[in-house]
Amino acid sequence: MDRIIEKLESGWWIVSHEQKLWLPYGELPHGLAANFDLVGQRALRIGEWQGEPVWLVLQHRRHDMGSVRQVIDQDAGLFQLAGRGVQLAEFYRSHKFCGYCGHPMHPSKTEWAMLCSHCRERYYPQIAPCIIVAIRREDSILLAQHVRHRNGVHTVLAGFVEVGETLEQAVAREVMEESGIKVKNLRYVTSQPWPFPQSLMTAFMAEYDSGEIVIDPKELLEANWYRYDDLPLLPPPGTVARRLIEDTVAMCRAEYD
């Protein structure tokens, strides 16, 4: 339940609007509410970090509004809370009216949900599951440059899970669609909330089975096998893609060094 922020309230402040985050001095605001002109604003407590509350404030600031990507290199827990705040802010902004009857809605006091008093419909934040997979062939890993990454970054393959599809089926389909190869020995590794805008990345490792690389030009600029000790520009630390690549490199080193 939200509350009015008082002068001596302190903590971490997620000030968000339209999927943007207020980052004065390039950092998440931390400290007394009075120091950030937040006294009197409505805020929702969305978690705790290092023993202090994390507050969500639905507000636009004229300056220093940026992407949550700018805090990705901070601690994973803090990045996750920042992502939660941005996703919740967008959820509340986009669910002011009921999609069934058109009447105004209001936030639930007990959970992350919006309620319609007219038809009693209940809405929850939508989460889009995605798969991301590192594919190994002997001492090499399959890396691709995506159409949306024209800065030279090469990463592992990923894609959204379709309706009525298992995670395993999504891996096989996405890999085939984007690269033209088949994989085997799929193994789940980890997951990562990814607020761009509302994804949950489910990470896997797999082994090459068969086929030659044939890229989908609508998705990829190029794809190739890279030996573990001769890699191109990689995604930044803190991303699950980087974790998968580093784990694959570690396995290759153990076998081939």
Swiss-Prot record:
CDD domains: NUDIX_NADH_pyrophosphatase_Nudt13. Residues 125-248 form the Nudix hydrolase domain. Divalent metal cations. Mg(2+) or Mn(2+). Binds 1 zinc ion per subunit. One of its GO terms (molecular function) is manganese ion binding. A divalent metal cation 3 binds at residues 174, 178, 219. It comes from the Bacteria. The gene is nudC. It comes from Salmonella paratyphi B (strain ATCC BAA-1250 / SPB7). This is NAD-capped RNA hydrolase NudC. Zn(2+) binds at residues 98, 101, 116, 119. One of its GO terms (cellular component) is cytosol.
